[in-house]
């Protein structure tokens, strides 16, 4: 495995995704927590501006930021279909976002992925949905990059896979003395991409457009 970030935490495996959730999402407790946050900030929670804030925040987090916890990446990708093609398949600029667990701020950007088929092809929408399943969690950009590449090999039966993510990290962009245009790039190569410099070069050239 050739990745820009290798996590040596023993609980991290190719089959696990994001910070592990130990219980189901509790909508009521989440809304109460948002109200407590507003009150702790000195803001009234029952005004025309904030009366529905807790509900709106909960819906956003449950449906868009953390919905990956309710999606199995393997099921999202599906089984694909049989095809003898073995040439590289590349998809550029798939929207991706997740939530950094350090500051509870999102990161957002684009994922470029490629895989080398080994008898099966996969729908492009399915691949994008798999990325949602992996990234819409409390997680790190480095983990998402690693897990997407591994999932294409493990679940997609590919000979090799590549993933490169370029994203804005709000915890970085909102830090002191920042210019506001910082981007983080992470990449991971698995299987035949690991040793095949030509394949990696072809992938990187293609995503530059």
Curated annotation (Swiss-Prot):
Toroid-shaped homodecamer, composed of two pentamers of five dimers. Keywords: GTP-binding, Hydrolase, Metal-binding, Nucleotide-binding, One-carbon metabolism, Zinc. Pfam families: GTP_cyclohydroI. It comes from the Bacteria. Zn(2+) binds at residues 100, 103, 171. Pathway: Cofactor biosynthesis; 7,8-dihydroneopterin triphosphate biosynthesis; 7,8-dihydroneopterin triphosphate from GTP: step 1/1. PANTHER family: GTP CYCLOHYDROLASE 1, GTP CYCLOHYDROLASE I. It is an enzyme of class 3 (hydrolase). Its EC number is 3.5.4.16. The keyword Zinc applies. One of its GO terms (biological process) is one-carbon metabolic process. The lineage of its organism: Bacteria, Pseudomonadati, Pseudomonadota, Betaproteobacteria, Burkholderiales. GO terms for molecular function: GTP binding; GTP cyclohydrolase I activity; zinc ion binding. Belongs to the GTP cyclohydrolase I family. Transmembrane segments: none annotated. InterPro entries: GTP-CH-I_C/QueF, GTP_CycHdrlase_I, GTP_CycHdrlase_I_CS, GTP_CycHdrlase_I_dom. It catalyses: GTP + H2O = 7,8-dihydroneopterin 3'-triphosphate + formate + H(+). This is GTP cyclohydrolase 1. The keyword NADP does not apply. GO terms for cellular component: cytoplasm.
